[in-house]
Structures are given as structure tokens and as C-alpha cells.
Amino acid sequence: MKFYTLRLLGFLLMVAGLAACDMEQEIEVKLPVLPTQLVVECYLEEGKPIRLALSESAGYFEGAQPVIIHNATVTITKNGSQVIPLRFSVDVDNENEKITNYSSRHVIQSQPGDVYTLTITDPTGRRVTGSTTVLPPAPLDSVGYKFNDKPKESQEAYLYIRWQDDPSRENFYRLLTHKNDSTGGVDSEMDAEINDRLRNGQKIIYTTTYRFDRGDTLNIKLFHLDRPYYEFISSVEDARRSNGNPFAQPVTIKSTVAGGYGVFTHLNYNTRELIIK
């Protein structure tokens, strides 16, 4: 009996060894070589000059250093008549941690319904176009907070924001909240994309978890977005969450421009400052 047991054990060890040989296998995936595309990022804001970042795309495993495009012809046209040329100029925005390389001193002054059109042509003939319509600002009604029932020294508050949705149109929103830190910097506390698909024409109330302390200073911005920009930022967030996850589906960034990648939009928002006391 002992003899058969030893033979069986030896057989099982041999099978395990053979199976282990097949568990590791190098697979070489040949990625397609895609042509580079122009990449643009431009946000128009009321009362501010125009700044635009123009670079080109790169492969996933290539260096992250962007290729800055020189000598491109960049124009923004307002309502089909007023042409605003942008010139090459590298500017560093330390507050928002952005670098732009085309700009104009023209200050954005617009009304809801105004249309801005972007046209870019680089020296090799690549062309990018985009268009954005100015929306009315989101009517931010009220912001407030409420503490939990813990002892005062350990209490935390949740934040609530209220606004009225316009029933006459499809609406998309982005809600940002930043907190001033002790070093004079700013920490992001909330970034939410919201639509009115289930709340058309209703009072929208958005709340956070209990996360804020007494003495916190919060800066709240409610953006009114068009559908292309809403889909752009939603796809960017989906791509960020799936990056590095072997079980996640690949995500395609939904650009707001044609002929390349990126975003061109007008930002219209209301802002409030709230101190937790």
C-alpha cells in the first residue's frame, strides 16, 4: 500500500510540474502605429483674456513630455464676424498648474447665445475646428452645511448646494468645491458631473458626506455645461478610473473638437464662499 501511495505522489508531482511549465508565457502584443494628432485645450472665461494650449498626441508608452506646436494659425471667431487671432506665447498659470502656448489680449465679454468658433491650422496642414455656445449661468440658490451629532470637538459637517433647473432645456452641470489649506494652498474636495435627466425643472439638491471641520473655508463653483463638454469631462474621469485596471474596458475620450483631440468650450459659472463655523 505504501508503494502505491509513493507512486501516486510521484505522479501528482510530475503533473504539477508540467502544469507549472505552461503557467507562464510571454505574449507580445503588436500595437498599431497611429499618426499623431493635434491636441487642443482652450477655456473661454468671462472677463479674462484668451489662453490656448496646442500640442500633439503621443503613444501610450512614449514619453509624457508634450510636443509644443509652433507657427500654427489660430483664430477664434465670435458670432461669425469678429475674428480674434491668437499668437504664439508660452504662459505659465501657477494657480491652475497649466501651461499655454497661444494667447490673445482680447478679453471675453459675451451674452448667452453668443457662438465662438475655433480654427487651427498647423504648418503641416493639420486642421482642428470647434464651436461653443455661451449658456446662461447656473442659478446657484443657496449653500449650507449641517454638523453630525458627535461631541462638538469631533463634529464634522456635510455640505449642501441647491439650485433650480431650467425645464425648457436639457441641462448639464459640474460642481467643484475647494478648501483653503493651512499653507495657503487649495485642496480639491469635490468634483461632480450632474445632469437633469431625472430632475428636469426641479430644485436640485446636492449633498456631500460628513467631511468638513469648523474653520474650513470652502470655495464652491457651479458650472452650466453644454453636452459636448459634459461628455468630455465624464469620459476623462472614466479613463482615469480605468487606467491600470486589467479588467476595465478601454475608454475613448470624447473630444469637443473635430480633426484632433481636446476641448474648446466657454465656462459659465456661479461661485460662493462658505466658512464652516
Feature roles, as predicted:
Residues 17-20:
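C-terminal motif of bacterial Sec signal peptides marking the signal peptidase cleavage site
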Residues 22-277:
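A sequence/structural signal for flexible, mid-protein segments enriched
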Residues 8-11, 32-33:
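Hydrophobic alpha-helical context, especially transmembrane and signal-peptide helices
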Residues 1-9:
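Bacterial N-terminal signal peptides that target proteins for export
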